[in-house]
Amino acid sequence: MSSQGKQYEYLDHTADIKFQAYGKTREEVFENAALAMFNVIIDTKKISGDTAREIFLKSPDLESLLVDWLSELLYLFEVDEIVFREFRVDNIREENGEYSITAQALGEKYDLKSLPFETEIKAVTYNQLEITKTADGWKAQVVVDI
């Protein structure tokens, strides 16, 4: 992790929600970006991890892979009604000009009565999107449309 040991932090944005996620590896920064996004929706500490989803995605570049990863998790929340609390990215590979991610997301079936959500996220955007290698590892900046 980097930026004084933080997993992520929220930044000021006029209309949407912007955050930066940190990690020692690309895999860790993707995990922490997912955690930051789900903590916008709900307090992830209140969620059990009894439901798992395997995720495999391919994208033309690392930035698109991050957007696709977060968008897939948001899709699973909206369609399968699963809220996630933990993310395990096994690997991110670059091969033949494409990036791929193999990961697992752990959470539980969403129940509005016991788990009221805080903020609805409409979409993950490319606005101000950045993924950079830093002296401490990796940093990703993401803006989500609310």
UniProtKB/Swiss-Prot annotation:
Coiled coil: none annotated. GO terms for biological process: tRNA splicing, via endonucleolytic cleavage and ligation. GO terms for molecular function: calcium ion binding. InterPro entries: Archease, Archease_arc, Archease_dom, Archease_dom_sf. Ca(2+) binds at residues 16, 145-146. It comes from the Archaea. Pfam families: Archease (PF01951). Keywords: Calcium, Metal-binding, tRNA processing. Signal peptide: none annotated. NCBIfam families: PRK00407.1. Activates the tRNA-splicing ligase complex by facilitating the enzymatic turnover of catalytic subunit RtcB. Acts by promoting the guanylylation of RtcB, a key intermediate step in tRNA ligation. Can also alter the NTP specificity of RtcB such that ATP, dGTP or ITP is used efficiently. Belongs to the archease family. This is Protein archease.
